[in-house]
């Protein structure tokens, strides 16, 4: 029994399909990726013979580009992609740790290790350098610290823009880089040395947004 075409289905996409396509000719993209320019009437006939929908995906091209595909499946793929994207956005958290322009090496290493771990887990991070009292006169130290952070975290992230002063605070943002993280994890795995869990941060230090 021949499968019923989906021309009566109300599409969620803004594409023209089947009889809605009225241009003289179109460029067809076949399921195997090959392409061919043909008269629209022939393309519609071909779609019907192969039990596909003719879906216009690039209306402004010359000639317009159409795909031979099942509209229902295409909508499902688009919906799944959107849901996966929303899910990923929901699980991404902005984590923040605070530093001072005179942060000592031990504190710097400890907090930077936590920032690195946050990034490896896919979180954005913000390093906030706080200038207390008259320490604001040492802005250059804050900027130097921002560069040290950038260098230290470059193995798993990219800095998002330049460090930005707001009042007596200097903000530095970092975005996780999946390729860098994957490469970092591979190198870690090759060492064969089990990674020890980090000591927990004080409650006042672990900030989420």
Swiss-Prot record:
Gene Ontology biological-process entries: ribosome disassembly
Domain of life per record: Bacteria
Subcellular location: Cytoplasm
MF terms in GO: ribosome binding; translation initiation factor activity
CC per GO annotation: cytoplasm
A Pfam family it matches: IF3_C
Keyword vocabulary terms for this entry: Cytoplasm, Initiation factor, Protein biosynthesis
Similarity section: Belongs to the IF-3 family.
Role description: IF-3 binds to the 30S ribosomal subunit and shifts the equilibrium between 70S ribosomes and their 50S and 30S subunits in favor of the free subunits, thus enhancing the availability of 30S subunits on which protein synthesis initiation begins.
Assembly notes: Monomer.
NCBIfam families: infC
PANTHER family (alphabetical): TRANSLATION INITIATION FACTOR IF-3, TRANSLATION INITIATION FACTOR IF-3, MITOCHONDRIAL
Protein name: Translation initiation factor IF-3
Provenance organism: Chlorobium phaeobacteroides (strain DSM 266 / SMG 266 / 2430)
Gene that this sequence comes from: infC
